[in-house]
Amino acid sequence: MRRLLACSAGVLCFSQLGALELFLSPKIGITSVYQFGSNGGSDGTSSGKGVSFDRLIGRVDLGLILVNGLTISASAESSLTNVFVRAQALIGYAVRVGGLRAIVSSGVNICGDSCATSEGKSSAWYSKLLYSVPLNLEVQYYLTSFAGVAVAASTAVGVRDFNFKEFTLPLSLTIGPTFRV
């Protein structure tokens, strides 16, 4: 009975019962991106090294955590301070202890010209959609939870944009409600 109550509260359902967990999480926060690599300035920048971009972002995650911790998710991220839209489809593994969850995931990252120009690059260099491989490590801490709704503060660090011999290392801090079924 205690397990069922905990599951309905949305806190221990995944860890105790091993049940499927569907979640929707709109977030708002700040991302700082450090860019490094060797591109010879062919993308419109001087060297592509040591460039930092800070932006206020809005993000929505929709995903499913399976019985064994495997997680499948899709996310859309947009800058609130300039034109920037990024979409990701990810597969990974989630480990959860109490109100703390860690997710390691990778998949496909897609963005267009708006992504390029917001990061100081020539839009002509990205005349089509940019596909790259993200590697994300996200740690979430649930501040409170009731009736399946949780407020989560999360930080994510990952290496993205494995393209043109260039890497970006984004650091994000976001907060928002997480709705779980």
UniProtKB/Swiss-Prot annotation:
<feature type="signal peptide">
    <location>
        <begin position="1"/>
        <end position="19"/>
    </location>
</feature>
<keyword id="KW-0732">Signal</keyword>
<dbReference type="InterPro" id="IPR024471">
    <property type="entry name" value="DUF2715"/>
</dbReference>
<dbReference type="Pfam" id="PF10895">
    <property type="entry name" value="DUF2715"/>
</dbReference>
<protein>
    <recommendedName>
        <fullName>Uncharacterized protein TP_0698</fullName>
    </recommendedName>
</protein>
